[in-house]
UniProtKB/Swiss-Prot annotation:
Prolines at the third position of the tripeptide repeating unit (G-X-Y) are hydroxylated in some or all of the chains. The gene is COL4A4. Residues 29-38 have a biased composition (Gly residues). Keywords: Basement membrane, Cell adhesion, Collagen, Disulfide bond, Extracellular matrix, Hydroxylation, Repeat, Secreted. It is found in: Secreted, Extracellular space, Extracellular matrix, Basement membrane. GO terms for biological process: cell adhesion; extracellular matrix organization. Alpha chains of type IV collagen have a non-collagenous domain (NC1) at their C-terminus, frequent interruptions of the G-X-Y repeats in the long central triple-helical domain (which may cause flexibility in the triple helix), and a short N-terminal triple-helical 7S domain. Belongs to the type IV collagen family. This is Collagen alpha-4(IV) chain. GO terms for molecular function: extracellular matrix structural constituent conferring tensile strength. There are six type IV collagen isoforms, alpha 1(IV)-alpha 6(IV), each of which can form a triple helix structure with 2 other chains to generate type IV collagen network. The alpha 3(IV) chain forms a triple helical protomer with alpha 4(IV) and alpha 5(IV); this triple helical structure dimerizes through NC1-NC1 domain interactions such that the alpha 3(IV), alpha 4(IV) and alpha 5(IV) chains of one protomer connect with the alpha 5(IV), alpha 4(IV) and alpha 3(IV) chains of the opposite promoter, respectively. Associates with LAMB2 at the neuromuscular junction and in GBM. The keyword Iron does not apply. Pfam families: C4, Collagen.
Length: 623
């Protein structure tokens, strides 16, 4: 609450209160500023004698003294440094054969070996995208619109196929369905685009057009004419009867993220928080103004020398040099002085022979001697172990092996198989809406240079055309993420699989297990790689091709639902289109191996798809 008013003064002082508790230890005070110079104090008592002064500096070197008394017998001196190397003496007589010398020091480390060849690609790991979350409960279906009125005109005759009609008017928007009962979930990131729906049924055949004028008869066939101008749009026909119910569409993917909602209302005030911890001591305040000089204090009582510790005084000033003292006893040998070197003294008397010294430490290792003369040839050594089996004849048989990496990196040939060339993995071509397939196990599927349209077409009039029709090429794809827009120019490079053609000692074949186990190679054959059983493929216009199941091209090292991409030759772009399909051999469960009907299934998770695809292995016979 607020502070109360000051109370009235008491008439008399009360009794003294009880003794308070000792206060908490205060924080260390800050250093105060230097005070003003005080008045000179009273002369103190005589202090204790000071410490002995520090030794004075060295005096100048004295004059050379007279000859001293011969000293005591000295200790044997240290071994001197080895003298300089003597001159080369005359060659001595050949000595007897020496003892076998010690083992030499280990030699220097050998050079690093050459880089090994790239190993075969391992099996695909499990680093796929996790399974999608559970699907919410579908909302209530909206009301069905009223059917249109039936047409009045009778059906017309079947005419020639007319030009594509104009797009119809948009129909009225149906009423919105009721809100679903499922709780609202979090909106994930936009999913990949869904598959393209099935093509709709053909429209009714138009009326036959008028007959054209008769053409003139020429000797030579003319060039194809220019494209005609599109005719005027025909009148809209009467509405037709309602069609049959369509095939249910595929499950749609998650929609795109919706817009951000409006900010919510302000929440209620929270409860008051707990009291905070005690704060740190504040910074020192500013220095206050200098106070007035204080009064001179009274002289203090005489000091008690026993109660006060004696503080040693400062070293005294060096006193005057005293008189020269008497000659003292010979002291211990001092350290060498810094004066000038004196004159050499007279030679002393020869001392007695010293006691033989202790054996000195072994000397340093001498220099390496000169190389000896070559010895006589030794006896022949024992016969060595037989060497490993050779690689066979000095040439291969001319069989070709094609490897497709399904990445943007060139694959390495197996050990012992030289590489002939590298390139890009061509799957098939489409011209005049007809497909021409390439077996991925043959060398023709590895083109050295990539092009979205690697061919032209020619006619009997000696004229060739390039990039004037909607021709296409299809290539094995790499592991890059699916792009949202068609790729062009340098954007295409990371999406095309690389390949290599190698020379093999024998023909390679593929074996398929039709289950999840890796099939073994035949006896006396070795493995080149393992993979998944790739059967066939289709693209635009239901055109495509397939792989022979004995060909190595039917065993791709990695499984992908979209293993190839389409390149539009004329536009120079590539993309993964929704009408591209890949077909794979599947696993056959043991309970369905006796001519039983398969059960339909839809697999959306990558791991479940891999478990359904047959495994395979490519083998080659030992040479």
């Amino acid at each position: 609450g607020p502070k109360g008013n000051k109370g009235d003064a008491a008439s008399q002082f009360g009794p003294p209160g009880p003794k308070g508790e000792p206060g908490s230890r205060g924080y260390q005070g800050h250093f105060g500023g230097p005070g003003e110079q005080g008045f000179p104090g009273v002369q103190g008592h005589r202090g204790p004698p000071g410490r002995p002064g520090s030794p004075g500096s060295s005096g100048p070197p004295g004059c050379p003294g007279g000859q001293g008394i011969p000293g005591l017998e000295g200790h044997p001196g240290e071994v001197g440094d080895p003298g300089p190397r003597g001159l080369l003496g005359d060659p001595g007589r050949p000595g007897p054969p020496g003892m076998k010398g010690p083992s030499g020091s280990p030699g220097l480390d050998g050079l690093h070996g050459l880089k090994g060849q790239k190993g075969t690609k391992g099996a695909s790991g499990l680093h796929e995208m996790g399974p999608p979350g559970p699907m919410g409960i579908p909302g209530i279906k909206g009301d069905k619109g009223e059917p249109g009125s039936p047409g009045i005109s009778p059906p017309g005759l079947f005419g020639e196929r007319g030009p594509p009609g104009l797009p119809g008017r948009p129909g009225p928007v149906g009423p919105m369905g009721a809100t679903g009962r499922a709780p609202k979930g979090d909106i994930p990131d936009p999913g990949p685009p869904g598959d393209q729906g099935l093509p709709g049924p053909d429209g009714p055949r138009g009326a036959p057009g008028p007959a054209g004028p008769p053409g003139s008869v020429d000797l030579l066939k003319g060039e194809p004419g220019d494209c005609g101008v599109p005719g005027p749009p025909g009148p809209p026909g009467p509405p037709g009867p309602p069609g049959c119910q369509g095939v249910p569409g595929c499950d749609g993917h998650d929609g795109q993220k919706g817009p951000m909602g409006f900010p919510g209302l302000q929440g209620p005030h929270g409860l008051p928080g707990l009291p905070g911890e005690k704060g740190l001591p504040g910074s020192p305040g500013r220095k206050g103004p200098t106070g007035p000089p204080g009064y001179r204090g009274e002289p203090g009582p005489p000091a008690d020398e026993d109660s006060c510790p004696r503080i040693p005084g400062l070293p005294g000033v060096p006193g005057p040099r005293g008189p020269e003292g008497a000659m003292g006893f010979p002291g211990q040998r001092g350290p060498p002085g810094q004066g000038c070197k004196g004159e050499p003294g007279l030679d002393g008397k020869r001392g007695r022979d010293g006691v033989p010294g202790a054996p000195g430490p072994p000397g340093h290792k001498g220099d390496t001697g000169e190389a000896g003369r070559p010895g006589a040839p030794g006896p022949p050594g024992p016969t060595g172990d037989p060497g490993p089996k050779g690689l066979g004849p000095g040439y291969l048989s001319g069989f070709l092996l094609v490897l497709h990496s399904q990445t943007d990196q060139e694959p390495a040939c197996p050990m012992g198989m030289p590489r002939l060339w590298t390139g890009y993995s061509l799957l098939y071509l489409e011209g005049q809406e007809k497909a021409h397939n390439q077996d991925l196990g043959l060398a023709g599927s590895c083109l050295p240079i990539f092009s979205t349209l690697p061919f032209a077409y020619c006619n009997i009039h000696q004229v060739c055309h390039y990039a004037q029709r909607n021709d296409k090429s299809y290539w094995l794809a790499s592991a890059g993420p699916l792009p949202m827009m068609p790729l062009s120019e340098e954007e295409i490079r990371p999406y095309i699989s690389r390949c290599a053609v190698c020379e093999a000692p024998a023909q390679a074949v593929a074996v398929h297990s039709q289950d999840q186990s890796i099939p073994p190679c035949p006896r006396a054959w070795r493995s080149l790689w393992i993979g998944y059983s790739f059967l066939m493929h289709t693209g635009a216009g239901d055109q495509g091709g397939g792989q022979a199941l004995m060909s190595p091209g039917s065993c791709l090292e990695d499984f992908r639902a979209a293993p190839f991409l389409e390149c539009q030759g004329r536009q120079g772009t590539c993309h993964f289109f929704a009408n591209e399909y890949s077909f794979w051999l599947t696993t056959v469960p043991p309970d369905l191996q006796v001519f039983s009907a398969p059960s339909p299934d839809t697999l959306k998770e990558s791991q479940a798809q891999r478990q359904k695809i047959s495994r395979c292995q490519v083998c080659v016979k030992y040479s």
